[in-house]
């Protein structure tokens, strides 16, 4: 990867880190014990980030990537392969390694409370991610062994049902990758 090729993603990562908590102030609530919570700040933050980036006339590619990374920057999961496959599907194969970098950076910027546990979880997720890539496990429709053309060839009528069947197959294969076969 040349520096020139890497520059656009550096821009995306920097903008994501700048904007990832932009909605925290407006989403802050305090419970009866005086503990602050920021529920849904990630979703609201993605909306705010999108408006800011549009106003600043960023290109659609940057806008889409930053918005998605802001939306999922706080997405947490157990370090288990099926959870990582599910997250890769939600976040996107291309953005998932950047999601991991953002989670690490955000964790390092937070209080030390449970930092080691959080970093250990992220490291486990990263190990699962690398294993999924190594095994070429299915995490998206384009990786499914069965296509819409296959379903039509087997007698299914073209239409919305094909998309629904493919989505159901994808969900099954994300849970159990060994089922990703033509049969």
Set out the residue ranges of the language-model regions.
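His-Asp-centered metal-binding catalytic motifs of divalent-metal-dependent phosphohydrolases/nucleases
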Residues: 10-37, 41-49, 53, 60-77, ...
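Short acidic (Asp/Glu) and glycine-rich catalytic loops that position anionic groups and cofactors
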Residues: 22-30, 44-50, 77-83, 100-109, ...
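Histidine/acidic-rich helix-loop-helix segments that form or flank divalent-metal centers
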Residues: 58-116
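Generic structural signal for hydrophobic core residues of well-folded globular domains
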Residues: 16-22, 73-74, 91, 102-111, ...
């Amino acid at each position: 990867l040349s520096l020139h090729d890497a520059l656009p993603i550096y821009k995306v990562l920097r903008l994501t880190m700048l904007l990832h908590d932009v909605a925290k102030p407006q989403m802050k609530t305090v419970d009866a014990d005086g503990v602050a919570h920021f529920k849904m700040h990630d979703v609201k933050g993605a909306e705010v980030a999108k408006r800011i980036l549009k106003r600043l006339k960023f290109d659609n590619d940057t806008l889409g990537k930053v918005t998605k990374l802001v939306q999922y920057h706080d997405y947490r999961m157990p370090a288990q392969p099926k959870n990582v496959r599910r997250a890769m599907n939600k976040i996107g194969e291309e953005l998932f390694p950047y999601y991991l970098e953002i989670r690490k950076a955000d964790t390092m910027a937070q209080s030390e409370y449970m930092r080691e546990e959080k970093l250990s979880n992220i490291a486990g997720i990263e190990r699962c991610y690398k294993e999924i890539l190594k095994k070429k496990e299915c995490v998206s429709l384009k990786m499914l062994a069965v296509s819409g053309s296959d379903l039509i060839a087997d007698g299914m009528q073209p239409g919305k049902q094909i998309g629904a069947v493919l989505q159901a197959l994808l969900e099954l294969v994300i849970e159990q990758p060994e089922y990703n076969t033509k049969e």
